[in-house]
Amino acid sequence: MQEFNVSLTDKPGELATVASAVGDQGINILGCVGMGRSTASVTMVTDDEEATAKVLKDMGRDFEVNELILTTLSNKPGALAEMATRLSDEGINIISFYIMKMEMDAADVALTTDNPSKTKEILGI
């Protein structure tokens, strides 16, 4: 799974334009975060990575693609802190983090790091 980090201009309608272009192609956005402080961007996870890349290229958007690592955490206090500490103790920097699905006893999460292969090894993936 991958995330798409798309550069935007910080003005009204930018998110709507990108989200509409993706949705018009039948692509579902599974997770998304947008920022508009110093530079505007939207980072999204979709159900069709190839089609998403094509839409963004066809729009002439600047974007980067990062590998997402999927794992499941217990839905209990401290679970996220435990995982983050395990990675931090090994010098791994978490770049992005998504809660993809929450259930009573578990949380499916996705993250990007500066060392995906080592992250997978540490998390037993």
Protein language model features and the residues they cover:
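A conserved regulatory-domain signal marking ACT and ACT-like small-molecule sensing domains
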Residues: M1-I125
